[in-house]
């Protein structure tokens, strides 16, 4: 069977992610693969924020701050869940879709392009022997979280 097809057919989401993380050179290849996603009019709506090491604690703080500011009836158990969420993986890639004005390419198509870039990231990591999982939930498609990342109004986090 063709190796590319085999990789697609055998890829699974991995809930328990552990070190080692991909090297800088491997991540360059992963991001090159991501940018080969379909992209009508070559708008390049996709960008990526790579988080590891001390950045995981910063992401944890963002999640907890957001939860405390926005969720009613927040239990200590739920706060702990949000606090620990970034530490389920030693490396997190935040998928950001940037809306660009174009007469023939609506925003949804640009978001889909970033989604396919995310799939390419997952396939590239799988081909390199790493596990991956796409997560969304309350912290994706969320303007308040995007603000905490310093993103602009036209930028949306579509997954982690």
Residue ranges and their predicted role:
Residues 1-88:
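N-terminal amphipathic, basic helical "cap/leader" segment at the start of enzyme domains
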Residues 7, 92-94, 160:
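Conserved hydrophobic/aromatic beta-strand scaffold that supports enzyme active sites
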Residues 34, 93, 99, 103-147:
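Small-aliphatic-rich amphipathic alpha-helix that forms the alpha element of a beta-alpha
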Residues 64-74, 104-109, 148-149:
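Short, surface-exposed loop/helix-turn segments at secondary-structure junctions
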Residues 68, 87-100:
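Acidic-glycine-rich active-site phosphate/pyrophosphate-binding loop
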Residues 90-92, 131, 156-158:
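Structural motif
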Residues 149-160:
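A glycine-rich helix N-cap at a beta->alpha junction
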């Amino acid at each position: 069977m063709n190796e590319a097809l085999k990789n697609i057919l055998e890829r699974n989401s991995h809930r328990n992610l552990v070190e080692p993380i991909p090297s800088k050179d491997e991540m360059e290849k992963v991001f090159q693969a991501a940018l080969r996603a379909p992209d009508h009019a070559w708008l390049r709506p996709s960008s990526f924020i790579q988080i590891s090491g001390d950045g995981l604690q910063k992401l944890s703080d963002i999640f907890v701050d957001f939860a405390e500011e926005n969720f009613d009836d927040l239990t200590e158990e739920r706060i702990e869940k949000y606090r620990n969420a970034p530490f389920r993986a030693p490396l997190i890639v935040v998928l950001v879709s940037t809306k660009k004005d174009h007469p023939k390419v609506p925003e949804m198509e640009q978001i889909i392009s970033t989604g396919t870039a995310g799939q390419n990231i997952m396939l590239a990591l799988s081909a390199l022997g790493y596990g991956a999982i796409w997560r969304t939930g309350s912290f994706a498609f969320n303007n308040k979280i995007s603000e905490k990342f310093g993103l602009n109004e036209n930028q949306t986090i579509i997954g982690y």
